[in-house]
Every structure is written in C-alpha cells, then in structure tokens.
Amino acid sequence: MTDGTCETPSTTPNFQTELAAQLADLVPEAIADGKVDVEKLKELLESDIVDSTERFGLFWPGKKRALRAAQEPTTATLRPDFENSKDWETTKNVFIEGDNLEVLKILQKHYHAKIKLIYIDPPYNTGKDFIYPDNYREGLQTYLEYTGQVDADGKAKSTSARNTLDNPHYHSAWLNMMYPRLKLARNLLKNDGVIFISIDDNEVANLRRVLDEVFGESNFIENYIWESNFRPDNSSRIERENAQHVLCYARNKSLLTGLVGAQKVTQGLPSLTKSSMKLSTLTFEPDWVEFQLPDGSYSAGERSSGYTLETDVTVLEGRATSSFSLTGRVIWSQQYLEQQVFDGTRIVIKGDGFVPYSRKLATSTLAPTTLLPRDQVGDVLAGNAEIRGLFGDPVFTHPKPTTLLRYLINSVTSDDPDAIVLDFFAGSASTAHAVLALNALDGGNRRFVVVQLPEPTPDDSIAASKGYKTIAELARKRIDLAGAAISQLDTGDGVDNGFRSYRLADTNFSEWRMSSDVEEDALQQHLLSLRDSATDDATADELLTEILLKQGYSLTEDVSAAEMGGLDLRLVRDRDGDVAVLAYLNEQTKPTLEQLRALVDEPPTRIIVLEDAFQGDDELKTNLAQLAKSKGVELWTA
C-alpha cells in the first residue's frame, strides 16, 4: 500500500511465504534476518521430531517437486465464457474449463475454507487412462499451447499422456499428478468439510497413504465399497471385479457432527386400530402408504379384519397408484393423520385385511455403512442409462450414476442446504447433475463448482461423431440437459440449474517472465510491452474477473455495467444490493478528479482503477486516494 492505495496482487498466494509468516508469529525466536532458522526450529521442537532415518511414510521419485508445484504461485486467471453459460445473471453454479492444478490455485483466495464437500473421480492409472501433465515449472504455458491459446513456435506439444504399464515410474507419475492437487484441495475445505475420492485397486493403497499425509490419519473416515456392476463379467475364472473404493476423509474429523446414511426407524409397527373407537373414515394419499402386498388390484368392500375399503386400490411396487379411503375403528382423526405424515410418519399395510400401522421416523440418523447400499446408489449401468436418457447415445463411458453422488452429497450436506460442492475432475459432470437433482428432491440450494480439462474426445468415439470436440464441451451440455429435465419435474421449480462458464487463461496484465539469458532484442520488446498495465485485447469483464479473483471475490458476484460522472464503469453489488465495488477499467481515457469524486461520493466499499488510467499523473492519483480515505473507501489499482 502506497499513499493510501492498495495494489492488486499479480499472482495467487505464495504458500511458502505465508507459512513462514505464520511461523514468525508462532515462534519468532526461530526467525533470523527475515528467514526461518531451521536449526533453531529443530531445537525448539527437539522432543517432537521424528528420526528421519526411521521415519514411516510414502516416498517416491519427484515428491519434493510435486510439493513445489502446489506451492508455486501462478499468474493465470479465468476468463468469463458468456456464450457457453446458462442464466449468467442469476446462477450461483460454476463450470471451469482448464487444468485443475492451475484452477485450484486461482480458487485459493476466495474459496479457502468455504467448500463443504469435494468429490473427485480421478484417472485410475490403469495404463489406459488420461494423465495430467508432469510439468510443474511451465504448467500454464504448456496448457496454453495445448489449448491453442498461444503458439509453440512450431513445436507440437501435448499436455496429455498415457501412463503406460511399461513406464518405470508408473506409480510415481500418478502420485506426482495427485499430490499437489490434494494439497491445494484441502485448503478449500471448510473445517467440517469432507472429501470423497473414487478409486479402484490399482492405486487405492498409495492413495490412502497420500491422503493420510495430506489430511492426517486421524481424519480418515471410511473406505466405502461401491458395488459398481451388479452383473459382473463371467469370462475370467480368476477374478470378477465388480466393486470400487470411495475413500473419505475430513478436514477436521473432531468437528463433524456425523454423516447421514439412513434415518433410524423405531422398532415395531403400532396399529392404528382400537376396538373401543367409533367407526370413522380416513383418506390416504399414495405416497403416505407402504404396502407389503403383491402387486395387483384389490376390490372395494368389507375385509375380514373389520375394515372396509371404500374404493378399489391398485398396488404397484409397494405403492398405491391413487388415493383411497378406509373405514374402521381407528384411533387417529384425518387431521392428526395428515400432521403425522407431515412430521415423517408413514403408514404400512401388511396384508389384504388393510389394517393400517404407523412407522414413525426417529430424529436420529445412522452413518453410511462401509458397503454402500446397492438399492440407493445404483451401479455403472444406471449411469449409462442416465447418459442415454439425456443424449440419446452413450457419449460417455462408465459415468458414475447420480444416485451414488446424491447419496454421498446428502450424507454431508443434509443439514447444510446451501453448501458448495467441488469436483475438479468433472468428467461427465455427474457431480453437477447430482447437486441439481438433490436440490430438486429436498428443496436445497446447494451450489457446484466443477473443473474439467478440455481433453479431446477420441476420433473414433460416439461423442466425436456427434460433433463434441472435448470432454469439457460434453460436460457443459450434460449439465444443460440435466437442468432442463429437472426443471420439468414437479419439484424442479425454483432449482438453480444454470451455470457460469469460465476458461483458464494467461493473465490479462503485463508480467515479467523472461529468462536471464534472453537476447537483447527480445528483452527490449518485452520492456515495451510493460508500458501498459493491461493487454489491449482484454475486455472490461475479463479484466474485472481477474482483479476480483485476486482480491478475494467469488466467481458469482453480482456485476453490471454502469455510467457515473461520464465514466463507463463496472459495478459489483453485495448480498444486500448495496454497491460494494466500482471499477474504472479504461486505461486509454484519463478521468478527471471531478469524475472520480462522483465515484467516491457514491460511496462504494472499494474503488478499482487501472494504474495506467492515471497516465502518469501522480497528483491525480494522490488526490483520489485522499478523497477515498476521507470517505472510508478503499482505493485499489491493478
């Protein structure tokens, strides 16, 4: 901060620097000349230090480099993709196309400790699946070349690779991909947040040990078993694999109130019948009653139990197809019956005597069982059926069913209907679909943030034949189709089925990224490019998105264009509708002090002005800073 002006950071947080600052606060005696004195720190922690020669843990080639990949700040940003968004102005859901390592770094500022649940279904390292680039130093540059945003000087480079079984670093390559992403993901979880990771036998042992290190062994919750195929292959006489793992860890297990797998029901089924009661009639809606009768039609008339069925009843899969009435010596009135049903009680009819019993749901719940209930979570064939139902063709292979994802999401968010759910290996977008479906079921307002690399669809795939060029494009379409289908449901009215779409991109602002041995001509050209703080082709919305992200705002802020004092502005409102930010992002036109005074008089919480908009007029900048300070307004430049 200089002269009351705050400067927007050019990169994401530097975790090494932040950790050192935290150590300085905790143990100032371990800081010498502004640096951490490791020997002094060891001396202070002597009784708690593990002998490194006998330490237990998971080690592999490249681990230190992978850790540095997580700690290295990035200048990357996200650019709004209005064309591929749905309900941009109102939605709170986010779809991001890009390399998830870079994206996770970008999300650190605002979404730190804000995510309730993370679910990921990463590559299983089977020797056939896609592996993210093992390139840490130039991750963003490689990504930009891969997606065609910059050229590679004629050299064809690809981010994708196959981690084949003959690779001598087969397991370490996969671990190097996962480790930095998990480190960054943990930062985003709320203190009572939970992560679920689907995996098969190829890497479950290694993944478990990595998660023990990243999250702590004490925060392990369960290794859930999902029966992924109800009809396994019969071709092998040695193995018939039909299950996968879902590893679950908490950020801080001691803060969890519990996970919800099922509601605990009271034992027994009290009858609604009492012989001393007068005859009365009750009417039952179809979803109030569970029949333990064979499917079929049951005629109206008096039953041997003493009850009279007033209307014909058709039972299908344990439910009546329409409402019906019973007359008998019941202890409940119609009003009391309706209140009990509203409170969660269900009626059970066990035989053709049509005697009604009550089943009350207790307030307590049961945690999920290790073996996930097949009748609630479905298998991969259910996932295939969902894709066919939306697209008409199997454009994704082996997608996770939304029933599985709904079960997992509900287990953590049943008491937090406004939770944010993150999936940074979005794939077929089952997680986003599941969030929308669960909101429709229980009236929740959960939001999703999903990230997917623009991995090309195989040339010989059905998806490619249908014109879908990337998995990211397919995923967006799946969310769109799922949202449209859910909006047609009786319970789908009011569900936020839109999403804001963003793409990973290089910064919109000039940056220093030249090597020390650069040729003189190239250096001069780069210095000339630094004269402007922003690139000429960046739009105001692109500039504002990057600035807001690096200042800690979300990807779903209420942003609009506005004119004030003759200046074209971008305006950001808070939840109450008040002006939080006014941004002037035109470096070509220098504003006058009177025009800037109009901004301060609004007054917003914060004013953002491009540095080059002052065009070197330090007096104008200083006067604006003094005006802002007098009104309690923060002045930021970029």
Predicted feature residues:
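DnaQ-like (DEDDh/DEDDy) 3′-5′ exonuclease domain used for proofreading
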Residues: M1-Y119, Y124-P180, L610-F614, K631, ...
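Conserved S-adenosyl-L-methionine
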Residues: D3-G4, W60, N100, D134-L144, ...
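Conserved proline-anchored active-site loop of SAM-dependent methyltransferases
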Residues: K114-I131, L211, V421-V435, L548
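SAM-dependent methyltransferase catalytic-core segment centered on the flexible catalytic loop
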Residues: K114-V194, N202, S218, Q244, ...
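Signature of N6-adenine DNA methyltransferases within the class I
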Residues: K190-D192, D201-A262
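Active-site-adjacent helix-turn-beta-strand microarchitecture at beta-sheet edges
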Residues: N229-D233, N242-H245, N252-R388
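PRPP-dependent phosphoribosyltransferase catalytic core
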Residues: A437-A638
